[in-house]
UniProtKB/Swiss-Prot annotation:
Pfam families: Ribosomal_L34. Keywords: Ribonucleoprotein, Ribosomal protein. The gene is rpmH. One of its GO terms (cellular component) is ribonucleoprotein complex. This is Large ribosomal subunit protein bL34. GO terms for biological process: translation. It comes from the Bacteria. Residues 1-45 are annotated as: Disordered.
């Protein structure tokens, strides 16, 4: 049987895709800047 690959976990989600994680690296800040420029309502998870 094939298991479902997406096993939601709020803590892990934030640790990997969260705002603070994005801010902690140069490229992450680039991501946020891009999303701001595009006008995203939500910048990160």
């Amino acid at each position: 049987m094939v298991k479902r690959t997406y096993q939601p976990n709020k803590r892990k989600h934030s640790k990997v895709h969260g705002f603070r994680k994005r801010m902690s690296t140069k490229n992450g800040r680039k991501v946020l800047a891009r999303r701001r420029r595009k006008g995203r309502k939500v910048l990160s998870a």
